[in-house]
Amino acid sequence: MAQLLNSILSVIDVFHKYAKGNGDCALLCKEELKQLLLAEFGDILQRPNDPETVETILNLLDQDRDGHIDFHEYLLLVFQLVQACYHKLDNKSHGGRTSQQERGQEGAQDCKFPGNTGRQHRQRHEEERQNSHHSQPERQDGDSHHGQPERQDRDSHHGQSEKQDRDSHHSQPERQDRDSHHNQSERQDKDFSFDQSERQSQDSSSGKKVSHKSTSGQAKWQGHIFALNRCEKPIQDSHYGQSERHTQQSETLGQASHFNQTNQQKSGSYCGQSERLGQELGCGQTDRQGQSSHYGQTDRQDQSYHYGQTDRQGQSSHYSQTDRQGQSSHYSQPDRQGQSSHYGQMDRKGQCYHYDQTNRQGQGSHYSQPNRQGQSSHYGQPDTQDQSSHYGQTDRQDQSSHYGQTERQGQSSHYSQMDRQGQGSHYGQTDRQGQSSHYGQPDRQGQNSHYGQTDRQGQSSHYGQTDRQGQSSHYSQPDKQGQSSHYGKIDRQDQSYHYGQPDGQGQSSHYGQTDRQGQSFHYGQPDRQGQSSHYSQMDRQGQSSHYGQTDRQGQSSHYGQTDRQGQSYHYGQTDRQGQSSHYIQSQTGEIQGQNKYFQGTEGTRKASYVEQSGRSGRLSQQTPGQEGYQNQGQGFQSRDSQQNGHQVWEPEEDSQHHQHKLLAQIQQERPLCHKGRDWQSCSSEQGHRQAQTRQSHGEGLSHWAEEEQGHQTWDRHSHESQEGPCGTQDRRTHKDEQNHQRRDRQTHEHEQSHQRRDRQTHEDKQNRQRRDRQTHEDEQNHQR
């Protein structure tokens, strides 16, 4: 028999000789591997009797981490040794002459993976290559980017193609673990676009020279174990920013990608890249552990969804992305700590954007942008702590939005935006910890939703958003601590919204929402403990509101809201620490002309009620020039500790300075504030009955009782503090409020018409998405 075939059979016989010791001829255990190394390679091992030597070699070879070495893993050892010996002998035989190809081998060897060259070696291992799991027949430029002219270098450019772990962009045929076009994922979180990868030294079996260009993570054999290579340096060379987690690359943690590489803490992106450990993305990719996606992707554990996604545990979505800490999206890519995106890019602390970008931590928005921890979105994406959204983006503390962006402390907004912590939104989103959503997405524990989303600690909403401490709103703006908004949603911990969906524990709903503990709503949202209501919402302790929302610490609402301790309002908003309202925000600044109906006499202005939750004395802001009507007749609230009429309100925003002046003026004329439980004087019983009839749950009854008690308390205090002018003003204001309510009802009917038009617009957008999806499928077919 030929010498080469005898050598091949000898390699196989040695494996079976030691593998059959425990009865399993297919695997080598640790003890059997030790015997094989001592007997066969003892002369060249640096420390043959050192237990760490066996442990190190076992860890390098054991790719499936089962504690045993199978035949193809055993072949890796043989290949490594053959390559090292060949390299040494070749250098000696040629003296000082070294071809460029050999220098490429040296560079690859410095990267802890000796190069494999020469037709002789391919012939020698032709049969082993057939048996090798991680090797495969060579393609002529098949796995190379734009094709490499050199036969042996083509797979070394930007990553090696291998049989198991390479994901190919533009669909390369692969045997195991190939993911789809524009959406690849890999066994151990490796996403590749325009790029191939291998796990340790797979291409060596197929006779491919791994040049210095490849950094797919080779195990450092020489210089670490075998004495004949102790002079070699463990230098990792990376091309186009290949990700390498540590100096040793074990490919499961360091993926190479073409035009798409990232490092653990440096995100490089071309058309958007992201990944904590080096996951690459092509035109829309993945998240923390390498989930890739096209027009909607996945996240940490690869949960996929269509048109509406979720995040923390790896929900991917089509036309909608999210992930736990690195949401990628089409035309928008993030990465774990550096969010990038196409048509809007950003990174962790230097976010750049195209078509509108904003703020400190890089919230971009237009065709979707991510945020601090890399949330990007196309047609709306969220993530666990930073949700971005299309036509309106946001991030953790910097809400951005399309047609109106904002940043952390400089909030801009289209059609009027505001807020201390930067809530901006137009058709848009915002929240403190990243509430995104437009046609949007789910939340932390993977609640997915269709056309409307929420997230774990970030509320998303369609046509108006809010968040815990920074609520944004459309055609209506909130105040310092996040009063939202129009058509808009709010809640502290996971309220989802219009055309939208679930929350922290995965409550989903269509055209209706829920919050963290599963509150669902229709055209109206609840708050922390999940009070749901139809055309009427309530908050933590059962406050209902009509067309409005509330939340635990920032009750906002459209068409009437309530706040934490059960103050309900119709056509108005409030929140715990800063009540805002749509079509007129409640604040002392009503005297500034926000309320068209309080623009009359000075006496009426003085009698206008200050809306505040009383919890911490924070007054709600109102954006000047907002349209709408104010129906809150909230009286002054004071906590038990606030018994002095000349109480001092600490300004929290410069924008409230004028409000405090007005408040002081009102308080001087009204020395006594009502004692009580933070009851806000509410609108007339007629308004309450209207709100009550539209509540969908029984909490409305208890809430009504509380409100009646609030009226009694207020009346009692009014009699106790019989101040003639003050009582007269109160009664006059009460009548004015009844008139306001009638006008508000008319406005409500107009808003219903707007909603119908919005639904029609929504259906048109759905049709556009279907066309986009069809176009995308056509592109996929064309690329195939």
Swiss-Prot record:
One of the Pfam families matching this protein, by short name: S_100
Renumbered residue ranges of the record's region S-100-like: 1-91
Cystines in this chain: none
Entry binding sites for Ca(2+) 2: D62, D64, D66, H68, E73
InterPro entries named among the record's database cross-references: EF-hand-dom_pair, EF_Hand_1_Ca_BS, EF_hand_dom, S-100_dom, S100/CaBP7/8-like_CS, S100_Ca-bd_sub
Cited Gene3D superfamilies: EF-hand
Cellular localization per UniProt: Secreted, Extracellular space, Extracellular matrix
All residue ranges annotated as the EF-hand domain in the record: 13-48, 49-84
Keywords: Calcium, Extracellular matrix, Metal-binding, Repeat, Secreted
Polar residues bias spans: 286-296, 304-343, 356-392, 400-486, 504-584, 610-646, 680-695
Keyword Heme: no
Coarse class of the protein's main subcellular location: secreted
One cellular component term from this protein's GO annotations in UniProt: cytosol
Residues where Ca(2+) 1 binds: E32
Tissue: Expression is scattered in the normal epidermis but strong in the acrosyringium, the inner hair root sheath and in the filiform papilli of the tongue.
Region (Disordered): 92-221, 282-584, 601-661, 677-784
A molecular-function term among this protein's GO annotations: calcium ion binding
Residue stretches of biased makeup (Basic and acidic residues): 124-201, 704-722, 729-784
PANTHER family reported for this sequence: REPETIN
This protein's domain notes: Can be divided into a N-terminal domain with significant homology to S100-like calcium-binding proteins, a central domain containing a series of short tandem repeats, and two flanking segments with low homology to the consensus sequences of the central repeats.
Record family assignment: Belongs to the S100-fused protein family.
Function: Involved in the cornified cell envelope formation. Multifunctional epidermal matrix protein. Reversibly binds calcium.
Protein name, per record: Repetin
Organism: Homo sapiens (Human)
